[in-house]
Amino acid sequence: MGAEIDSRIEDEQKLVDDMLKVLPEKAARNRRKHIVVRNCSTEQHIEADDKVIPGILTNRGCAFAGTKGVVFGPIKDMVHLVHGPIGCAFYTWGTRRNFAKAEEGGDNFMNYCVCTDMKETDIVFGGEKKLKKAIDEVVKIFHPEAITICATCPVGLIGDDIESVAREAEKEHGIKVIPARCEGYRGVSQSAGHHIASNALMEHLIGTEEIKSPTPFDINVFGEYNIGGDLWEVKPIFEKIGYRIVSSLTGDGSFHRISQAHQAKLSILVCHRSINYTNRMMEEKYGVPWLKVNYIGTKGTEKLLRKMAEFFDDPELTRKTEEVIAEEKAKYAEDIEKYRKKLKGKTAFIYAGGSRSHHYINLFEELGMKVIAAGYQFAHRDDYEGRQIIPQIKEKALGSILEDVHYERDENVKPTVSPERIEELKTKIGLMDYKGLFPDAEDGTIVIDDLNHHETEVLVKTLKPDIFCSGIKDKYWAQKPWSPSRQIHSYDYSGRYTGFSGVLNFARDIDMALHSPTWKFIRPPWKAENVE
């Protein structure tokens, strides 16, 4: 078995080396640092969060996409005002499938796209007056209690003072107006926008309201964007056990609830990359501990629920947890097993953002499938190697323009968990830690950061995965000539994929993709070509 693993690692490394030969020497040297063929017997490192090589077709987004599209966009009762050209404003609920329902007596502005529509004359003479007028119109039409201003590239280039416009609008209209300097060039990917949005949430929202009736089991759900209704799949499970979700950040989120997030007893973190900044700052200022979790897959959901029960250490809560786990597993086990038999032995290639690639490795394995390549669009090294690597990460030039905010503990805060218990839980359940993707990628798996179209073509054609899971930008690039594909960013209008029932939904969708009769009418290139 050892010789077989060594042979696989050697073959995959040769594939990577051959794939990079077409690039100029300097570019090839750069990309080689972003690709690792897993060898679990040795310590490995990967380069990430670096600027894209000019001329390479990347799948990344910009800082504006990270702030407006990912973090701010799903907050339903705020009007998100794009200050910039109309082309930037398309990044809305229609592209992300963030679902939301209005709170009782509340608002839901998710379906609206509001933009200042800057023109050439605004670039020349400035856009501040146009921004003020847009805010006035938003207040007149929608009567929101809060507005965000999301700046695009031209705004930063001409120097519009969106902060002063926001302050004046707050005084004039008596509402919250939150400016975000999220111009697209502020960082190497959408990850910079996540950071900017997290800072804004802490500065302007979190800690500004109080929970009227606290309960012993109040929690936050961080890094959940309710794609296709994912949050709504797991929320009833939490409530059945006895938890109350104070705030979801930010899927189906309300700015009032986000303002109360500091009073939760525990924050669970789904997408590590997009919002771990807020978790860290909340723990520093308000003492709210966080727990990295994965509720995609039966095993992941079980593990999460048991860790949460361990954190609260309440006998009745623990009993209810086991009861709900047994009940939910029994509902879907038989149907899941039918699909597992059909999918066993199939291979998958995953390329996504946030923590999704990691989570779906676990889910594919649960279905008997093997992940042969995986990677992230906008990860940092700790998303691959774990948070223990953070002290060793050197700050890059573009990273220096992002404000890394730290807080002192609020003297009025009384910790709900003692420091001794926190240390104990760090060992028991991995509280406030994340081990990264590497530990769950087996020997020979190609782990690749910032996958580009050339690499997609070579890897998919050579590895011949049974399915390619990524986003809309590269879905058809892989699907047309080679492999069936599924989006795991917006689920191809399907889902939900979280919790116990999500496993069944996902297995059904993968089975349809792999065994659709339409594939009988297509001859893959590697079957048509004379391969020696």
From Swiss-Prot:
Catalytic activity as recorded in UniProt: N2 + 8 reduced [2Fe-2S]-[ferredoxin] + 16 ATP + 16 H2O = H2 + 8 oxidized [2Fe-2S]-[ferredoxin] + 2 NH4(+) + 16 ADP + 16 phosphate + 6 H(+)
Cofactor: binding comment: Binds 1 [8Fe-7S] cluster per heterodimer.
Keyword Transmembrane found: no
Positions contributing to [8Fe-7S] cluster binding: C62, C88, C153
Pfam families for the chain: Oxidored_nitro
Coiled coil: none
PROSITE patterns per record: NITROGENASE_1_1, NITROGENASE_1_2
GO molecular function: ATP binding; iron-sulfur cluster binding; metal ion binding; nitrogenase activity
GO biological process, one term: nitrogen fixation
Cofactor (UniProt): [8Fe-7S] cluster; [7Fe-Mo-9S-C-homocitryl] cluster
Keywords: ATP-binding, Iron, Iron-sulfur, Metal-binding, Molybdenum, Nitrogen fixation, Nucleotide-binding, Oxidoreductase
UniProt-annotated binding residues for [7Fe-Mo-9S-C-homocitryl] cluster: C271, H489
Similarity remark: Belongs to the NifD/NifK/NifE/NifN family.
Subunit organization: Tetramer of two alpha and two beta chains. Forms complex with the iron protein (nitrogenase component 2).
Record function comment: This molybdenum-iron protein is part of the nitrogenase complex that catalyzes the key enzymatic reactions in nitrogen fixation.
Protein name: Nitrogenase molybdenum-iron protein alpha chain
Gene that this polypeptide is encoded by: nifD2
